[in-house]
Amino acid sequence: MARYIGPKAKLSRREGTDLFLKSARRSLADKCKLDSKPGQHGRTSGARTSDYGTQLREKQKVKRIYGVLERQFRRYFAEADRLKGNTGENLLQLLESRLDNVVYRMGFGSTRAEARQLVSHKAIVVNGVVSNIPSMQVKAGDVVAVRETKKKQARILEALSLAEQGGMPSWVAVDSKKFEGTFKQKPERSDIAGDINESLIVELYSR
């Protein structure tokens, strides 16, 4: 399956919630009606969604939030199931620990897609070494920074300014003057923002 490159707001409308696919420069609720499905007048149906349909929608929503394709997502779930603890929470922690997501959480990219592009274009270093692998798992204590030659990019400066206004997650420590941050630890479930019901995904894969 190819990566979706169409209108981002349409995906959020389809899921009925903000998937944080667009920059925070303007509230998504101001741009489109999240309670209206895509289509000329919003698609409606009187039929009740099945349990399977609800579970599938939740999986699709999480895949879209993190920009992960089906095969990758299955691998993440298999790893989450193998680890000790709650499988659903493990899954979200693995997704949150992706380098592209950490770059986004540290405020170097205004969206996960932009953060992924920064990584792919070798604008990010981890512990002093350039990394261009968005799916790289960041570990506690790792230092993630913007390369010296990229620090003056307008999009990075703007993203960092917006992130500072909104506040950084507690599980990263960011020095905006140095354009670097430390991944302190994996986030707790309560630290992970977003309207996600990971138990539905566990139920889906347990069928």
UniProtKB/Swiss-Prot annotation:
**Which parts of the sequence belong to the S4 RNA-binding domain?**
97-158
Q: Which SMART domains match?
A: Ribosomal_S4 (SM01390), S4 (SM00363)
- Tell whether rRNA-binding is among the UniProt keywords: yes
Protein's GO biological process: ribosomal small subunit biogenesis; translation
Q: Which GO cellular component term is one of those annotated?
A: small ribosomal subunit
Q: Which InterPro entries match?
A: Ribosomal_uS4, Ribosomal_uS4_bac-type, Ribosomal_uS4_CS, Ribosomal_uS4_N, S4_RNA-bd, S4_RNA-bd_sf
Which parts of this chain are annotated as the region Disordered? 32-55
Listed A to Z, the keywords are: Ribonucleoprotein, Ribosomal protein, RNA-binding, rRNA-binding
Please verify whether the record's keywords include rRNA-binding: yes
Q: In this entry, which stretches build a coiled coil? A: none
Q: Can you tell which superkingdom this protein's organism belongs to?
A: Bacteria
Q: Which GO terms describe its molecular function?
A: rRNA binding; structural constituent of ribosome
Extract the PROSITE patterns matched here.
RIBOSOMAL_S4, S4
Q: Where is the composition biased (Polar residues)?
A: 42-53
Q: How does it assemble?
A: Part of the 30S ribosomal subunit. Contacts protein S5. The interaction surface between S4 and S5 is involved in control of translational fidelity.
Functional note: One of the primary rRNA binding proteins, it binds directly to 16S rRNA where it nucleates assembly of the body of the 30S subunit.
Similarity comment: family membership: Belongs to the universal ribosomal protein uS4 family.
* NCBIfam families cross-referenced by the UniProt entry: PRK05327.1 (NF003717), rpsD_bact (TIGR01017)
Specify the protein name: Small ribosomal subunit protein uS4
Q: Gene of origin?
A: rpsD
